Structure formats: structure tokens, C-alpha cells
Amino acid sequence: MGNTVHRTLPDPSPPARLLATRPCCGPGPERRPVLGEAPRFHAQAKGKNVRLDGHSRRATRRNSFCNGVTFTQRPIRLYEQVRLRLVAVRPGWSGALRFGFTAHDPSLMSAQDIPKYACPDLVTRPGYWAKALPENLALRDTVLAYWADRHGRVFYSVNDGEPVLFHCGVAVGGPLWALIDVYGITDEVQLLESAFADTLTPARLSQARFSACLPPSSHDAANFDNNELENNQVVAKLGHLALGRAPGPPPADAAAAAIPCGPRERPRPASSPALLEADLRFHATRGPDVSLSADRKVACAPRPDGGRTLVFSERPLRPGESLFVEVGRPGLAAPGALAFGITSCDPGVLRPNELPADPDALLDRKEYWVVARAGPVPSGGDALSFTLRPGGDVLLGINGRPRGRLLCVDTTQALWAFFAVRGGVAGQLRLLGTLQSSPATTTPSGSLSGSQDDSDSDMTFSVNQSSSASESSLVTAPSSPLSPPVSPVFSPPEPAGIKNGECTVCFDGEVDTVIYTCGHMCLCHSCGLRLKRQARACCPICRRPIKDVIKIYRP
């Protein structure tokens, strides 16, 4: 099934023999030595949470979601498939197995050389190549196979399915060890018997699908400098690696991967309001891995590994204004949850080459930055609305349905919106327009009474990724008691001084505590003390570390 033929290697260890494979190019077959011993996990080079069975064929991660990096005990030959069975999967974490190769001998590694994460900790170092398996493929008993060819390309397949090209530029001049990070929802994996993959003929190679569905998690959004190849570059080069190109029209997938970024003439989503102002565009300042259409209304990020794809609104949002965007391309699955944020920093003063891949890295800047993950993964073509209320609440809507409060921000200063566009064929963000509410407009009856259905997907702030779930439980932004109406219209804000506001943790006590050093006021004193005692405690609004909480007294 698919483009691979498995030739199972025997368990006994006979002398090395030669295996003739289907020629890739040239008149004769390529002959490669095959080791009889199946690969095993390296007994010493592993993360501190990894436990191996007696045969070093099964790796189990204990505790937390990280520190699960492992390697094979021997190098992997070119075209030799590393075959893994996902034995145990535990929902509740974010992200799944990471896999790839390294040119570094695990036997020479010390415990200090093995970090918590393969992505981004290892892949930002020379000689490491790895990416994430999409969570929708990380199912129990799934068999993953991946291999490298002599051109430095890495392919993978799931359950003997079609091969998917997901890496280029791997150094194949020396030995390569398999790198496997038992991460996130993946709890246990088992190394299976090796098999060799057929080399792909030019015709089959031209039909090989480039992976557009390896979305980075928050940990993967680092700088993948050693893996820089955009989809359109890969597709353009597939037929020129001493293979020639098969005659005929280009494959559909290649055309899809090279879709230009432009303002496509297609109808506006039916869920968006009919009358939207079209005065807002993306700012010219953007990440180096994202492109804008000529009118700066569409942002495209073709890289499946994400990259540095930050885009900003051209002007600050106005209090009471709703921003409407369309995520992805209709009919295609969106590649990952959208990262959205608010900042007081004028994008015009930023340098594009200094913009990070992970927007959380901006929280250390002196300006005001707030980052949130926009809830559940949207589908391609979904219309999202972000409403900045005069009181500072930022409300999220998906396809015209209110989904609760996303952020609480300081509206005493000019605030720009920014997004991290996820890569791949579906990596596109289109500005639909804005809608300004009238303060004098009376809200429809019942529009301010949030139901359970309206807030069943309330958002959480992006917390310190090294914290455990229990450590960050108090940092979760609780659901807003007020859900926005489908059409963004608002009542006048309450006069200052009438109410101090409710605690964003318990939603019961009155806000009477200042967080030091950021100065935000969003907690009652009891919740502030509880939060301060948590490991790596950080502000629910800006995520800066909490050094102290100070109770205030009002006259």
C-alpha cells in the first residue's frame, strides 16, 4: 500500500549483507549494507523522564509532558525506515511525538546535553532535524515510519500510507541517528523491525505530498534556521535533484503548495456582518517568513514548521471596535490554533529580523504585550472576531457565535493587534474589516446574559510552558460572565469608581490587589496570595513573573 515496500530484517545478527534496491538514477542498482540487528533505544542518552524496557525497544515517559528525548543506539542507514508504534496515548497535554535525525553520536552526550524538548531546544542547534507529528495522527497503535534518502530529504508515512516529504537539507555525508521525543499526549512508543523504503522514481516523486500538516505547538515555534525551505521552494526543486522531471502538467499538490499570496476574489463568510469598514490593513512590518498581498489584506505563511510569521494591524484598535478575520482557506483544515495578541508597541519601530517565531518571547520587552491562543483550532474559512470593549475586555467570536472573553487589557494607551499565522498550504489570514459599535446603542434583550453554550470554549492565557498543569492552574483565565452579542453592540461603560471589578480567578472577590512588578490589578487578595505561592507564578494578563502581591485600600 502506498509508495513503500517493506523488507523485514531478521532479528538474528548474521554478517552484514548487501541489498540491491530499485535504482534512483544511473544504470545499476544502489547497494547498501544492511545490519541484521533492529534499532534499539540508546540506554544512556535519554531524557530524565524516559524509562526503557529490558530490550531497549520500548520507551515510556513518566511524569510531566517533557524530558522524553531519546535516540537509537546505532546509526540509521539511508532509506532504512525507523518504524514506531504509538503504544500509549494520554489526552490532556498539548502536542504529540517529535521525530527526526541527528548527526551527533548519542554515546558522546552527557545528561546536560539532553534538553527538555527536541523542538525547539535541539533543532536550533546544528546537526539536529526534527518536527512534530500532528495530534490527529497520534492515535494509539498508529505505526509511524520515517527515513532519509541520499539527497537529504526525509519522508514519513503513517500506517503504511502514502509517503510525505517533511524535511530537506539533512546532512547525509556522515552517520545519522534517529531522534525521537516522547512528548505531549504520546506516552509510550515501541521500535519495530526495520524495513527499507523503495527509492522514489521521478514520476512518483513528483506526486509525493509535501507535508502541510505538521503544525508547531507553542514549543515548536522556535527559529528553525537549519531547516529553512518553504513549500514552494521544495516543490520547485523536487524534480531537479539529478532525477529529472516527469512530463506532463504539474501535480495538484505542487500547485497548491505554491499558491501565491493575493487577494482572492471570493465571497465574504456568511457569518461576518454585511457592513464592515475596509480601512484596516496589515502593517508593512512583518516576520520574515510571512508574505502580504499587494493590498496588505491577506497574510500567507507557506512554511509548515511555522517560522517567524508575526503580522500587525496597521493602526491601533479603537475601544468598542471589532476586528474580523478569516482563518485559512475554505475547504482546507487550518494548520493550528491561531496566536493573537495586543501590544502598545508601534510596529513601525520594530525590525523584521528581530521578530521571534514564538510571540511569547515578546513578553520580555519593555512595552505592553499580551498574548493568547485563540481557543479551539479553527477550520479553514472560519470567520473570527476580536472585540475590544471600552473596559478592556477582548471578546472572541467564531462564525458569528460569541465564545467568551479572551483577554483583559489596558485601554488607556494605543493598542495594536497582532497575529502569528500558522504555516502550510492552509496558512493564510485575511482581514475582512472592522465594525465600530455605538456607545448609545441599546443591546438587545438577553444579549448580555452569557449561556453555558456561549462560554464552553473560553480561552486560556499562554502560561509558562515549563510549568506543570497543576502549577499553572491558577493562571487560567476563567470564563467571562458576560458573552458578547452576535453583532458587536455594547452598552455604555460603567462610570469609573462605581465598581472595582471582579477577580479574574475566582470571579467572586473584588479586585483589591496590585501585582508587583507589572502593576496589573485583576485579583482579589486571597487569590493573589495563592497565585504567588505557585511555582513560576506569573500575571494572568501579561505573564510577567510575580514577585509580590500588594493589597490596596480604597476610601
UniProtKB/Swiss-Prot annotation:
SUPFAM superfamilies: RING/U-box
A GO BP annotation: protein ubiquitination
Known catalytic reactions: S-ubiquitinyl-[E2 ubiquitin-conjugating enzyme]-L-cysteine + [acceptor protein]-L-lysine = [E2 ubiquitin-conjugating enzyme]-L-cysteine + N(6)-ubiquitinyl-[acceptor protein]-L-lysine
A GO molecular function held by the record: zinc ion binding
Keywords for this protein: Cytoplasm, Metal-binding, Notch signaling pathway, Phosphoprotein, Repeat, Transferase, Ubl conjugation pathway, Zinc, Zinc-finger
Modified residues (Phosphothreonine): T199
Biased composition annotated in UniProt, kind: Low complexity: 462-480
Subcellular compartments: Cytoplasm
Primary location group: cytoplasm
Entry keyword Transcription: no
Annotated ranges, domain NHR: 38-194, 279-433
UniProt pathway annotation: Protein modification; protein ubiquitination
Record has Metal-binding as a keyword: yes
Record region (Disordered): 436-493
Enzyme class, UniProt record, top EC level: transferase
ZnF endpoints (RING-type): 503-543
Role summary: E3 ubiquitin-protein ligase involved in regulation of the Notch pathway through influencing the stability and activity of several Notch ligands.
Alphabetized PANTHER family for the sequence: E3 UBIQUITIN-PROTEIN LIGASE NEURL1B (PTHR12429:SF10), NEURALIZED (PTHR12429)
Protein name in UniProt: E3 ubiquitin-protein ligase NEURL1B
Native organism taxonomy: Eukaryota, Metazoa, Chordata, Craniata, Vertebrata
